[in-house]
Curated annotation (Swiss-Prot):
Compartment annotation: Cytoplasm; Nucleus, Nucleolus
Keywords for this protein: Cytoplasm, Methylation, Nucleus, Phosphoprotein, Ribosome biogenesis
Protein name: Bystin
Organism: Mus musculus
InterPro entries, per the entry: Bystin
Binding partners and assembly: Binds trophinin, tastin and cytokeratins.
GO BP annotations listed: blastocyst formation; in utero embryonic development; maturation of SSU-rRNA from tricistronic rRNA transcript (SSU-rRNA, 5.8S rRNA, LSU-rRNA); stem cell proliferation; trophectodermal cell differentiation
PANTHER family xref list: BYSTIN (PTHR12821:SF0)
Disruption phenotype annotation: Mice show embryonic lethality around stage 6.5 dpc shortly after implantation. Mice lacking maternal Bysl transcript upon injection of siRNA into fertilized eggs are arrested at the 16-cell stage, fail to induce trophectoderm, and show altered morphology of developing nucleoli. Embryonic stem cells lacking Bysl show accumulation of pre-20S rRNA precursors and a reduction of 40S ribosomal subunits in the cytoplasm.
Free-text tissue specificity from the UniProt record: High levels in preimplantation embryos, bone marrow, brain, testis and ovary.
Length: 436
């Protein structure tokens, strides 16, 4: 008997059921092949609009809304007019490389949601302020800005135009092309009115130029808005080398911060965020902002509190902090030095013994001081005793206890003495300690 041939796919087909079962099954609902369709619908729903297309859609919607408001007037007359962002021309590319330019509005909203008021006036104790003024430099050096240095270089070029300058004395600055001057004068107009939005491309390429200081001088940094200063700090901190970033901090950012505090008795939120953003390069921040502020001898209590709050809130590498503490401990004393040292000590770093020795010598230098030391000085000494009492040698502890006798404070000196006497010196072996 020949073999019965089965066609392809016949094995998967269902055999015919009896007629009664077919009639009963006909009344039931069958799912059919809807599963595949559902899978396709889910895949279609998961597709989303790309970020570039979303920005274009929002831009077109915003332009149409502005056209309607211009033709028919705003719907709500009682609402205050919305502050427009500075437009920099239609020719700028709308790619995703400039998304970070919108960072400031996000920061402002976050600050409002958190209830943080960086513009609140700093409360200063009058007694502490008078005590700090006693240790201020009576003949402070003249502060130099970027404009002063550029003008000095231009004057040198005019007086020595026919002289071939050696590598030691430097080189004369070249004349700028008139077209370049025209471009950056336009950038200056934008930065003087900048509130939010994207920055000109010509401004973003300044860190890559060899004569970036001269170009920056054309834009007149002293006339920038606070928001423009924040964006400039973000760009220069990210793209300049540490040495060049230090010059920008010292010649542009620091004078602006000090002038703003002196005028308004508080610091603008944009400038405060600029100081925090500058910590992207901690070495340049210490060399360009903190150390010059202490060396000036004119740092006020309000300036020290505001700048010191950034030290408290931000994470700083231990090597940079140790070097800064060593430098502050060895320089001439001013009241603000105690604030910065206390804040750095409160971060509880594992400091090298060289830094601890310099801090001890810093305090021992006041054994013959005739002026009344401020409370901030005693607080700094108390912080040193609390954080690093186990890292001090026996001779250092004895010298500090003698210092407390010469420079006493009715409330803080007993606490400092108790901290020093409760710890085992670092030069005493564990085996030599006897338990009573």
């Amino acid at each position: 008997m020949p073999k019965f041939k089965v066609t392809r796919g016949a094995s998967n087909r269902e055999k015919h059921a009896p007629l009664a079962e077919q009639i009963l099954a006909g009344n039931a609902v069958r799912a059919g092949t809807r599963e595949k369709r559902r899978g396709r619908e889910v895949e279609e729903e998961e597709e989303y609009v790309g970020p570039r297309l979303s920005r274009r859609i929002l831009q077109q919607a915003r332009q149409q809304q502005e056209e309607l408001e211009t033709d028919h007037g705003a719907g709500d007359r009682s609402a205050p007019p919305r502050e427009r962002a500075t437009r920099l021309g239609p020719g700028l590319p709308q790619d995703g490389s400039d998304e970070e330019d919108e960072e400031w509005p996000t920061l402002e909203k976050a600050a409002k949601m958190a209830g943080v008021d960086h513009q609140a006036e700093v409360i200063v104790d009058p007694e502490d302020e008078r005590a700090i003024e006693m240790f201020m430099n009576k003949n402070p050096p003249v502060r130099r800005t970027l404009a002063d240095i550029i003008m000095e270089k231009l004057t040198e070029k005019q007086t020595e135009v026919e002289t071939v300058m050696s590598e030691v004395s430097g080189f004369p600055m070249p004349q700028l092309d008139p077209r370049v001057l025209e471009v950056y004068r336009g950038v200056r107009e934008v930065l003087c009115k900048y509130r939010s939005g994207k920055l000109p491309k010509a401004f973003k390429v300044i860190p890559a130029l060899s004569n970036w200081e001269q170009i920056l001088y054309v834009t007149e940094p002293e006339a920038w808005t606070a928001a423009a200063m924040y964006q400039a700090t973000r760009i220069f901190a990210s793209n300049l080398k540490e040495r060049m970033a230090q010059r920008f901090y010292n010649l542009v950012l620091l004078p602006r911060v000090r002038d703003d505090i002196a005028e308004y008795k508080r610091l603008n939120f944009h400038l405060y965020m600029a100081l925090k953003k500058a910590l992207f390069k901690p070495g340049a921040w210490f060399k360009g902002i903190l150390i010059p502020l202490c060396e000036s001898g004119t740092c006020t209590l309000r300036e020290a509190i505001i700048v010191g709050s950034i030290i408290t809130k931000c994470s700083i590498p231990v090597l940079h902090s140790s070097a800064a503490m060593l430098k502050i401990a060895e320089m001439e004393y001013s009241g603000a030095n105690s604030i910065f040292l206390r804040l750095l000590l409160d971060k509880k770093y594992a400091l090298p013994y060289r830094v601890l020795d310099a801090l001890v010598f810093h305090f021992l230098a006041f054994r013959t001081e005739k002026r009344q030391l401020p409370v901030l000085w005693h607080q700094c000494l108390l912080t040193l005793a609390q954080r690093y009492k186990a890292d001090l040698a026996t001779e250092q502890k004895e010298a500090l206890l003698e210092l407390l006798r010469l420079q006493p404070h009715p409330q803080l000196s007993p606490e400092i003495r108790r901290e020093l006497q409760s710890a085992v010196p670092r030069d005493v072996e564990d085996g030599g300690v006897t338990m009573e």
